[in-house]
């Protein structure tokens, strides 16, 4: 991630450090919908400190007397943080919140809904991050530039595993490599999905880095697949003179490739750019068919509108901002700090 492009590269970073104490790293999940108040599934909004989402699910399922496999969550939240999120359980009774409290875990709200929570049932995540020793004035200048220019929607380093090994295994799997690691990933659905998604993310980051290097980050190219940032709808750019200003106004964004055998195709110049990237990698779109349902492909917005609110602390500053699901706070903090921005984020995709 240290060699990933920056949209505020000419501005000095704030410096400072992001400590890993839970209180310095707060994440509030913004759900895709709120529970209706009625239904067979118990919904609990919880706050946790120093515990993973899976640990919280296990603890609460045991206390409620339901199988852990039947519990639901919308996204994984990291252990080294203070986080809030909704969890669901097929429980008949409504418990007292105090009765479910345990070390590092408390229940904030109790409700009900018709369906189980599932991964992806989240709209966004709201972050509050303390930067110790950071220069507030420098952070403010970078935040202002970021709000105007847009955030490159890059994947954070946690997506790729230790030293990028997950992505390497994903590429090997798609190419039919007979190595032991690739064969093991092919047999294990979780490892297969993890490895292939890491490789897809690596290719997306390279595609976006090339767009930025060529001055095409905040505009449209003929044949681009564009994404409406309010609804998520996709369409193909027929006239960059028409759609380019819409990109600049954050109405739409170029939608980069998460390559797969069912990927919506770009056209013209945009397609040629994607084909050159695959050729440089020595892989073809048809190779992704080896990944089956884990490698169908999709489109991801390349540029996001992000406004960072900054407040002074005695020894630094507090950064508050919201990102859509699947986007990484690490990317925002690199723009502000320029160094020392590694974050203990859980990978939710």
Swiss-Prot record:
This is tRNA pseudouridine synthase D. HAMAP family: TruD. Pfam families: TruD. Its EC number is 5.4.99.27. Belongs to the pseudouridine synthase TruD family. InterPro entries: PsdUridine_synth_cat_dom_sf, PsdUridine_synth_TruD, PsdUridine_synth_TruD_CS, PsdUridine_synth_TruD_insert, TruD_catalytic, TruD_insert_sf, TruD_pseudoU_synthase. Keywords: Isomerase, tRNA processing. The active site is at residue 78. Residues 150-304 form the TRUD domain. PROSITE patterns: TRUD (PS50984), UPF0024 (PS01268). SUPFAM superfamilies: Pseudouridine synthase. GO terms for molecular function: RNA binding; tRNA pseudouridine(13) synthase activity. Responsible for synthesis of pseudouridine from uracil-13 in transfer RNAs. Residues 1-22 are annotated as: Disordered. GO terms for cellular component: cytosol. It catalyses: uridine(13) in tRNA = pseudouridine(13) in tRNA. It comes from Anaeromyxobacter sp. (strain Fw109-5).
